[in-house]
A protein has these predicted regions:
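Extended hydrophobic leader/signal-anchor segments used for secretion and membrane insertion
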Residues: 1-157
Length: 157
């Protein structure tokens, strides 16, 4: 499906209360959602979205799954969500509650499904996110050091 057709089908399924499963594309979510992994999205009411959730929404550039950084309420009562990909340094353009379609509830990695609808609410999600980022940073540092020969294992050990 092209982007517009996928967007239309996704909107229809989620609006009807169905879950949506698809292959993620791109690298903006770093280690949380990798390019080519299967993700499952469940419909969500904007009032049930918390900071730390990965939401699926319609944006000016098409469908997007990014993490909620902040929830902002305007004086007129309109709610907007500041999103960012885990591998990004800057927030995306804020999205309105009407642009949210669902929340990513699981990701399939190497044949195993990982539940992202964590118990423990926002604190649990923040701990999970911190652990993912720490693991990614450690892996990156290990690769960088390993390429310089600093972390070479002694074969005699």
């Amino acid at each position: 499906l092209d982007r517009n057709a996928f967007s239309s089908v996704a909107d229809s399924l989620l609006a009807a209360g169905f879950k949506l499963r698809f292959r993620a594309g791109g690298h903006s979510m770093g280690s949380a959602l990798r390019d080519g992994e299967r993700v499952t999205v469940a419909p969500v009411d904007a009032r049930d979205v918390d900071v730390g959730d990965i939401v699926f929404c319609q944006t000016w550039r098409g469908p997007l799954a990014h993490r909620v950084q902040r929830i902002e309420q305007a004086a007129a009562g309109a709610v907007r969500f500041a999103l960012r990909g885990d591998a990004s340094f800057e927030d995306d353009r804020p999205v309105a509650a009407s642009q949210l379609r669902g929340r990513v509830i699981s990701v399939e990695r190497n044949g195993r499904a990982f539940d992202l609808a964590l118990r423990g609410g926002a604190l649990g999600r923040r701990i999970f996110v911190a652990a993912l980022r720490a693991r990614a940073a450690l892996a990156s540092a290990t690769r960088a050091l390993g390429t310089r020969g600093v972390l070479v294992r002694d074969p005699a050990a």
